[in-house]
């Protein structure tokens, strides 16, 4: 079972790798929050930096945003990567999409973006609280599935 499913119930970030691929303006608040929570933030500035990392390590959290390493007319290449992941891999990560145009916690927007949570960029001060709440709900949903899969297949 992935490390994302182990650890303390109240702190999903403790000893977990968090890949941060957001607009430069938003990097600092995320890095600061995850360091304070005991996580291991890994911020990247260009999409080309991410794919070599993903060959050797699968971060437990992906924090992505519109406008990352693009001119605005293109979609985020990392979001495309997550959307095309095999489902057994996708279930092992928690993806957050940051946008100025989407309301924080909008489930339909999260579903349409294939992420676990959407955050509005104006509400980044509450990001830790929002991510913890959403992660807890997500873990409650998938934990039964993963426990059953482990019992049936042994992996």
Which residue ranges define each predicted feature?
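Acidic, metal-coordinating helix/loop segments flanking the phosphotransfer/catalytic sites
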Residues: 45-61
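Conserved phosphotransfer microenvironments
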Residues: 60-86
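Short, structured coil segments at secondary-structure junctions
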Residues: 37, 57, 112-115
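C-terminal output helix
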Residues: 123-131
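Structural motif
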Residues: 20-25, 45, 64-68, 98-100
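A short, hydrophobic beta-strand element within the central beta-sheet of small alpha/beta folds
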Residues: 89-102
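Alpha4 helix (beta4-alpha4-beta5 surface) of REC/receiver domains from two-component response regulators
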Residues: 99-117
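Non-catalytic signal-transmission and effector/linker regions of two-component phosphorelay proteins
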Residues: 1-33, 133-155
